[in-house]
């Protein structure tokens, strides 16, 4: 089997998940496991590996859906914004990057193994609610759309135009948000 070709380090999590799954299938629980960072597993196409072994997964690639990364490069940041944050290493996950991610693209005919998408926000990069809001908004709108809209129906121009309506909502709620994708009033 494919399991026999893996190193012990890579095979052990699969073995443990299968071990715990077998005795509990009578009550139909959903077994969830996280790829621990002990071997930097987040830099591999884990959705493909999970599908190869018959596991369902929630798609959360770091290079697309980690919302603690900067929204734009430091050179593109508006100096008038209260917070421009995110990881300071130059890593960027823009609204466009999030929106253009197709969670099923790497699965081909195995799309049944995709349970959904998840955006991660590691809050050690934020000091208060305003910074957290800035990191999330408006990328949450892009994440929401990729979660429910088939890739064939996505339209960046349409999304960008619809996104403009959120500016007045964010302002009315006194939320801090990245204004890079909003047209001047």
Predicted segments, located by residue:
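Flexible, acidic glycine-rich loops studded with aromatic residues
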Residues: 15-185
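Single conserved hydrophobic/aromatic residue that forms the stacking wall/gate
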Residues: 1-10
